[in-house]
Regions:
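N-terminal single-pass transmembrane signal-anchor helix
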Residues: 2-36
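Non-catalytic effector/regulatory segments
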Residues: 3, 33-34, 51, 93-98
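Conserved catalytic core of two-component sensor histidine kinases
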Residues: 18, 45, 52
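Alpha-helical segments that scaffold the active site and NAD(P)H-binding pocket
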Residues: 25, 53-54
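Aliphatic-rich helix starts adjacent to a transmembrane/signal segment
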Residues: 31-48
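Periplasmic/extracellular, small/polar-rich flexible segments of pilin-like filament-forming proteins
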Residues: 57-142
Length: 142
């Protein structure tokens, strides 16, 4: 007498595998999201270093730092474009759309502060770079 043996998986086994894959996918998406956020913040900090180097060159040429105004500024696309402008700004290529940050520079010509504001997520992440400190400082919303 011959038995009919059908090999395969039960519905319960398939459901367990699908549930495990779902949990692993969720963890991966969360980890990837925080990775891209930290990458954007690092890129913004690097851009601020690039702006600072351009400021050093500008100071060597004109005996003052380039600023957009003396009062605290709010970084927008317009203020970022002023920094990029070769005639009116520092003339450095900033890929602000790729890193999702806007920049502005304020000060009195003998000192300057660079501000960066996130253009993604909650849009409250702000990074500040001062001539005195020479490092980028993030607020608590980053």
């Amino acid at each position: 007498m011959r038995k009919n043996l059908i090999a395969g998986f039960t519905l319960i086994e398939l459901l367990v595998v699908v549930a495990i894959l779902g949990v692993l996918s969720a963890v991966g998406i969360i980890a990837f999201g925080s990775y891209t956020t930290s990458t954007k913040m690092s890129a913004a900090s690097n851009t601020m270093q690039q702006i600072s180097l351009a400021q050093t060159e500008h100071f060597a040429d004109s005996d003052s730092y380039w600023v957009d105004g003396t009062s605290v500024c709010t970084p927008t696309e317009a203020t970022t474009k002023k920094i990029i402008d070769e005639d009116k700004g520092l003339g450095i290529p900033i890929s602000y759309k790729d890193i999702s940050f806007y920049f502005c520079i304020y000060g009195d010509g003998t000192d300057y502060t660079i501000k960066a504001l996130a253009d993604y997520g909650s849009k409250d992440c702000e990074i500040t770079f001062t001539l005195a400190d020479q490092k980028a400082v993030r607020n608590d919303k980053c």
